[in-house]
């Protein structure tokens, strides 16, 4: 039985698997199969919109979701793939997630922000799969009565997403003696707000 406030949104451009023959012989786990995405959650009681998708993110949609006549400030944050990490040229990032847990964690973060900052709405979208340089991996939009709580909520939600949400990324590098495709898996929490590493890295050649 579906929770009365839990209303899945329908994406107009769903991702369709392109290799049905290979997937039938060696099926991917459900949470790693792009054909099972986007996965979205909408909680009408707090105007919360959550999304995990393999499609490019749509900042205009994120802002439209949170607009409210009671909001005096709308803040949008876009996290993009930068061209270097630790002075090494980056080819791309690849994100993976365990969606059932990740969506529950995102809901907890969003509800906490709504309560703490009296938000009129919040939208959190995270892209999965390959995200190339200058493309967006996360979009966070918040609406509040005034600019100060909107700014603070946006930053706090971002930091909590990086610290707690069950999403992992692989950084693939080029040049500097490394062939394209060399990379490292790490949790989002492994880098701080300045892009510096925290803790040990898990290397993959």
Curated annotation (Swiss-Prot):
InterPro entries to which the protein is assigned, alphabetical: MoaE_sf, MOCS2B_euk, Mopterin_biosynth_MoaE
Enzyme class: transferase
Keyword Cytoplasm applies: yes
Subunit structure: Heterotetramer; composed of 2 small (MOCS2A) and 2 large (MOCS2B) subunits.
GO biological process: Mo-molybdopterin cofactor biosynthetic process
Catalytic activities: 2 [molybdopterin-synthase sulfur-carrier protein]-C-terminal-Gly-aminoethanethioate + cyclic pyranopterin phosphate + H2O = molybdopterin + 2 [molybdopterin-synthase sulfur-carrier protein]-C-terminal Gly-Gly + 2 H(+)
Cellular-component GO terms for this entry: molybdopterin synthase complex
Function field: Catalytic subunit of the molybdopterin synthase complex, a complex that catalyzes the conversion of precursor Z into molybdopterin. Acts by mediating the incorporation of 2 sulfur atoms from thiocarboxylated MOCS2A into precursor Z to generate a dithiolene group.
Name of the featured protein: Molybdopterin synthase catalytic subunit
Main location per the UniProt record: cytoplasm
Pfam families: MoaE (PF02391)
HAMAP family, per database record: MOC2B
Record GO terms (molecular function): molybdopterin synthase activity
Region of interest (Disordered), residue spans: 1-36, 179-205
